[in-house]
């Protein structure tokens, strides 16, 4: 199997309940992650969808929607191994690459198999599947997610070769939050976003309410971000267009007209949309984490007192600060 696995930390299970002195509280979450394995996070039952690479791309995306999942491991029958992941990013890349106009059907989406798309997309730049063993530490998992700039990490049993679970930033942070009250609170948890400088505050990728979906897809491809704040003419955030919203084009079979505005494309969820989840630079890291976990979102939009966008704080930023850098800016 051509895969990249993260090596087990030598300290993976040395200490189930690390005893930190007050001076070393800043590393308490790092110690926790090093003392728990990926296996500890796997629920007793969860849905996992696997696609064979010979499946048609269109059917695969409809299956993602039907099953309510955002990604699926890809099984290559010829190689008898998992070779990659199919995600909403692939759907975006296909639409952006092949869309011509509302009058022309996207042949490649209708007819291509997953293996054909992978050959076109990867070409000569072969990327091995990044995965992890269930015995590896959660610290290794966080490191792998951030180092490889990925959002999903398959947990694959090295003996059977079976995919057991898919780890995400969201699931790891939720797991950490379950135990967070048992630890002495690190000093940095009471510091503000501004003090810690966590997040992205330069070259924020955004769209206007009138921006066509096709243009938004191009921004996703170019900037490699997972969401775009939607702003009015004064730069105030009024909505957010995420990669997950794009899969609705498949759900409603409206992917043949990408000239509509993001505002129109977002109308499908207006009946339950509670508004953009925001935060301020003066708010503490503890407040930010609580908001992210409780709302089960992947990022918060940082705004000023007028709701003008100042930055984005993602789950990746949070985990990097908590686990890899002990609250300090990397």
Curated annotation (Swiss-Prot):
| Domain of life of the source | Eukaryota
The biological processes this protein is annotated with in GO are: cellular response to glucose starvation; fatty acid biosynthetic process; positive regulation of gluconeogenesis; regulation of carbon utilization; regulation of glycolytic process
Q: Where is this region: Disordered?
A: 1-26
What is this protein for, i.e. what is its function? Answer: AMP/ATP-binding subunit of AMP-activated protein kinase (AMPK), an energy sensor protein kinase that plays a key role in regulating cellular energy metabolism. In response to reduction of intracellular ATP levels, AMPK activates energy-producing pathways and inhibits energy-consuming processes: inhibits protein, carbohydrate and lipid biosynthesis, as well as cell growth and proliferation. AMPK acts via direct phosphorylation of metabolic enzymes, and by longer-term effects via phosphorylation of transcription regulators.
The UniProt record gives the binding positions of ATP 1 as 70, 85-90, 130, 151-152
Subunit comment for this entry? AMPK is a heterotrimer of an alpha catalytic subunit (PRKAA1 or PRKAA2), a beta (PRKAB1 or PRKAB2) and a gamma non-catalytic subunits (PRKAG1, PRKAG2 or PRKAG3). Interacts with FNIP1 and FNIP2.
Entry binding sites for ADP 1? 85-90, 130, 151-152
Identify this protein by name: 5'-AMP-activated protein kinase subunit gamma-1
Q: Per its UniProt record, what CDD domains does this chain match? A: CBS_euAMPK_gamma-like_repeat1, CBS_euAMPK_gamma-like_repeat2
Can the keyword Lipid metabolism be found in this entry's annotation?
yes
Share the record's PTM remark: Phosphorylated by ULK1 and ULK2; leading to negatively regulate AMPK activity and suggesting the existence of a regulatory feedback loop between ULK1, ULK2 and AMPK.
| Polar residues bias locations | 1-13
Molecular-function annotations in GO: ADP binding; AMP binding; ATP binding; protein kinase binding; protein kinase regulator activity
| Annotated GO CC locations | cytoplasm; cytosol; nucleotide-activated protein kinase complex; nucleus
User: What residues does AMP 2 bind to?
Assistant: 70, 170, 242-245, 269, 277, 298-299
Q: Which ranges carry the CBS domain?
A: 43-103, 125-187, 198-260, 272-329
Q: Where does ADP 2 bind?
A: 70, 170, 242-245, 269, 277, 298-299
